[in-house]
């Protein structure tokens, strides 16, 4: 027997894009467009009448922009939302704000570049919408951790923390980092994100954390304590040791698990270069990127921890890590900062 289709409401002011997106979504046997609204006011009435499972929402719209509408929606009628973004600096800031307000995910409007790969674009859009329909909306919001305290970090046996995340991760990473003290070993972060968004993402983290956070932009950087480094959205971040010093370098080889940057690539390099002197953390996200790399870390003697199902927006990557035996510990997001600090002291 066929299961019930997930009901999608499309909100976009362009009639051409509404038609294209509706056609893409309806091509998926699990999804069905039950309506298309041209502005937030029309969307509000349609949400009440049609009760969609998931909403796609354009960031740039007349009358009221998508972010403002999302803010009202999350307060009055929380439901899974996937933002449709432009790959611009302004689009990046607005999208990250939308994710902070509770949107599950985003995808870019098709450009000339990605129309060439319309099949790939189609499957990306539908996968994100299917995932969002099953996401736990507000999982991050309810899990704000207390600021953790730590002592004697400089003498810890653990010389590096590696964090991997995908859907829901921009907020989970922020919650985790903003609750960590300023004194920490170097932290490397691979978050699945568009290249245009990784810089603004790092800047937002930097503004909300005691640690110094930056996007890795040069080919090779010596890793420093009390600093966190974010992989750019189009290159793998790898860690290696030269002499007594740890370095991160950017790798332009093909995508792994369909992702670039890939968490598996980062974790694998950490396993090789630090053996048991690292901590691996896998947070919310769809798919299974990071599970095999985390298993390598565990086999080399590192400590590994996965975010628990209840606090994940999407329990995909952590589930894969748990199921393959890679995760030694499973913790809710709000307990992770203190757990890391306890390990370090």
Curated annotation (Swiss-Prot):
One of its GO terms (molecular function) is protein-glutamine glutaminase activity. Its main location: cytoplasm. One of its GO terms (cellular component) is cytoplasm. One of its GO terms (biological process) is chemotaxis. Keywords: Chemotaxis, Cytoplasm, Hydrolase, Phosphoprotein. The keyword Transmembrane helix does not apply. The active site is at 166, 192, 289. This is Protein-glutamate methylesterase/protein-glutamine glutaminase 2. The gene is cheB2.
């Amino acid at each position: 027997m066929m299961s019930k289709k997930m009901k999608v409401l499309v909100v976009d002011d362009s009639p051409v894009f509404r038609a294209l997106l509706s056609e893409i979504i309806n091509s998926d046997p699990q999804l069905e467009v039950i309506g298309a609204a041209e502005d937030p006011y029309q969307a509000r009435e349609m949400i009440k009448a049609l009760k969609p499972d998931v909403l796609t929402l354009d960031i740039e719209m007349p009358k009221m922009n998508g972010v403002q509408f999302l803010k009202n929606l999350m307060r009055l009628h929380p439901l899974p939302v996937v933002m449709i973004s432009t790959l611009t600096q302004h689009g990046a800031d607005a999208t990250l704000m939308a994710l902070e307000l509770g949107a599950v995910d985003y995808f870019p409007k098709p450009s000339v570049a990605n129309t060439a790969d319309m099949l790939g674009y189609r499957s990306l859009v539908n996968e994100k919408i299917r995932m969002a329909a099953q996401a736990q909306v507000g999982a991050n919001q309810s899990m704000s951790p207390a600021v953790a305290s730590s002592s004697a970090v400089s003498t810890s046996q653990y010389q590096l923390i590696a964090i991997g995340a995908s859907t829901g991760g921009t907020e989970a990473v922020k919650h985790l980092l903003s609750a960590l003290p300023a004194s920490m070993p170097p932290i490397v972060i691979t978050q699945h994100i568009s290249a245009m968004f990784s810089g603004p993402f790092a800047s937002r983290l930097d503004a909300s954390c005691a640690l110094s956070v930056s996007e890795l932009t040069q080919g090779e950087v010596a890793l420093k304590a009390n600093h966190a480094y974010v992989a750019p959205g189009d290159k793998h971040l790898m860690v290696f040791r030269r002499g007594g010093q740890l370095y991160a370098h950017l790798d332009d080889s093909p995508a792994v698990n369909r992702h670039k940057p890939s968490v598996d690539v980062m974790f694998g390099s950490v396993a090789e270069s630090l053996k048991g002197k690292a901590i691996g953390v896998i947070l919310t996200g769809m798919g299974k990127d990071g599970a095999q790399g985390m298993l390598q870390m565990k086999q080399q003697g590192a400590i590994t921890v996965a975010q628990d199902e209840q606090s994940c927006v999407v329990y995909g990557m952590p589930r894969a890590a748990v199921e393959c035996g890679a995760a030694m510990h499973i913790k809710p997001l709000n307990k992770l900062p203190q757990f890391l600090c306890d390990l370090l002291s």
